[in-house]
């Protein structure tokens, strides 16, 4: 089932997500729904708060990045439950980011080029992954969602132009009206 997305000014996007304590059938269904939702909106990652669930879970639909920058997508997204970034490189790299919860806007964000992330999968097994480049960026972006942080919070002030802020306000108004706020 494709779930409704939470948008820019939704309070749930600013909350710290609760840890997942048990892997249930409901959690498995949430992951299936998130997978359909991510595919429908053509995302590369999706965090549970973006579909209204304030729990520490996200999915990533990219398996790897080829040398030419082309992305290889997974048949089924990788699941990260209670993820923790355990290592980050000191080298920061700027990259252009967007977010399904802030449709139509993109911005430059500096993030570490390499990370190691530890999490559980849907079978409850702990795993650790060393990632770099775009895959590392996806994991950091989605992990930020679990801490109530949006990519716009990580943009430099100079990149938040008046036009960017005006567009952000238009998004806020549009989706507040759609939600009946």
Swiss-Prot record:
GO BP terms: co-translational protein modification; translation
UniProt KW keywords: Hydrolase, Iron, Metal-binding, Protein biosynthesis
Originating gene: def
TM spans (from-to): none
Record protein name field: Peptide deformylase
Keyword Metal-binding annotated: yes
Cofactor note: Binds 1 Fe(2+) ion.
Source organism phylogeny: Bacteria, Pseudomonadati, Chlamydiota, Chlamydiia, Chlamydiales
Enzyme superclass (EC): hydrolase
């Amino acid at each position: 089932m494709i779930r409704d997305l939470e948008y820019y000014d939704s309070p749930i996007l600013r909350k710290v997500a609760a840890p997942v304590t048990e892997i249930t059938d409901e959690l498995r269904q949430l992951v299936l729904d998130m997978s359909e939702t991510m595919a429908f909106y053509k995302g590369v990652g999706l965090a549970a708060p973006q579909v209204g669930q304030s729990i520490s879970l996200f999915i990533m639909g990219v398996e790897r990045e080829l040398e030419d920058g082309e992305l290889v997508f997974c048949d089924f997204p990788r699941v990260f439950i209670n993820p923790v970034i355990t290592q980050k490189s000191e080298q920061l790299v700027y990259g252009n980011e967007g977010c399904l919860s802030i449709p139509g806007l993109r911005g430059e964000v500096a993030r570490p080029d390499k990370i190691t992330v530890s999490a559980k999968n849907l079978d409850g097994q702990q795993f650790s992954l060393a990632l770099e480049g775009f895959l590392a960026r996806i994991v950091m972006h989605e992990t930020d969602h679990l801490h109530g942080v949006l990519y716009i919070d990580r943009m430099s002030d100079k990149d938040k132009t008046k036009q960017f802020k005006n567009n952000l306000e238009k998004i806020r108004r549009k989706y507040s009206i759609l939600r009946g706020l």
